[in-house]
UniProtKB/Swiss-Prot annotation:
Exos-4.1 and tin-9.2 are transcribed on a dicistronic transcript where exos-4.1 is the upstream transcript and tin-9.2 the downstream. Component of the RNA exosome complex. Keywords: Cytoplasm, Exosome, Nucleus, RNA-binding, rRNA processing. This is Putative exosome complex component RRP41.
């Protein structure tokens, strides 16, 4: 199957450097301090943030807040038809990646000896799932009013015939394309997460990294608008 047609289009009609539509809804989970439902193309993610609250003794850190992430995916979320419950190897790996990323984003020193829980569930996976979780988590944290260095944005990019393609779908990922998931703060050069899937030739590394950084900047612009609009909508309520 050709990833890019002779006319320069991908299977879903996008150009190689074109991202999918991003739609979000914040504050849906009233039991959480912050929440976000995010659709990135056909990838759908729900994220909820709880805390900060007094941390468990096993998790407690004297001078900062402990970040605990749990990732899961529903049974019919993707092509695998496999339920990724909290605790399987891949889910644990993604959970740790999210923890490390957001430890670099959240101002954890503002909440010593406390704990912040982040739950991410992929309801429907159509590629770039980890990137979508990062983006949903950023908005859920913003909804919760958690102080951060800035909004984190992420993107998954691959290489076809030495040329980058951005925001991969599930069908593109199943072709075992060399790909990188990258996350940055405020769409700038401060990288907080890098995940490499499949072998990538060293000659293509800088190309795909540059494409991923540029895509993170594009995604950040979308997320920043959502966060600003949500803040404006909440301002009258907070004022009362």
């Amino acid at each position: 199957m050709n990833i890019i047609s002779e006319h320069g289009f991908r299977i879903d009609g996008r150009r190689p450097a074109q991202i999918r539509n991003i739609n979000t809804r914040l504050g849906l989970n009233r039991n959480a301090e912050g929440s976000c439902y995010l659709e990135h193309g056909n990838t759908k993610v729900l994220c909820a943030v709880y805390g900060p609250y007094e941390g468990k003794s096993s998790k407690r850190i004297e001078d900062k807040c402990a970040i605990v992430c749990q990732y899961s995916a529903t049974k019919f979320s993707g092509l695998e038809r496999k339920n990724r419950t909290r605790g399987d190897r891949k889910s644990t790996e993604i959970s740790r990646l999210l923890e490390k990323a957001f430890e670099s984003v959240i101002l954890t020193e503002a909440f010593p000896r406390s704990q912040l829980d982040i739950f991410c569930e992929v309801i429907q996976g159509d590629g770039s799932n980890l990137a979508a979780c990062v983006n949903a988590t950023s908005l859920a944290l913003a909804d919760a009013g958690i102080p951060m260095k800035g909004i984190a944005s992420a993107a998954t990019c691959g290489v076809v015939d030495g040329k980058p393609i951005v925001d991969l779908t599930s069908r593109e990922e199943t072709d075992l394309l060399p790909r990188v998931t990258l996350a940055t703060i405020c769409g700038r050069d401060e990288v907080i997460l890098v995940e490499l899937q499949n072998r990538l030739h060293i000659d293509h590394l800088s190309t795909v990294m540059d494409a991923a950084k540029a895509t993170c900047a594009d995604v950040y612009e979308c997320l920043a608008v959502v966060a600003q609009q949500h803040l404006k909508a909440c301002a009258p309520i907070l004022g009362n």
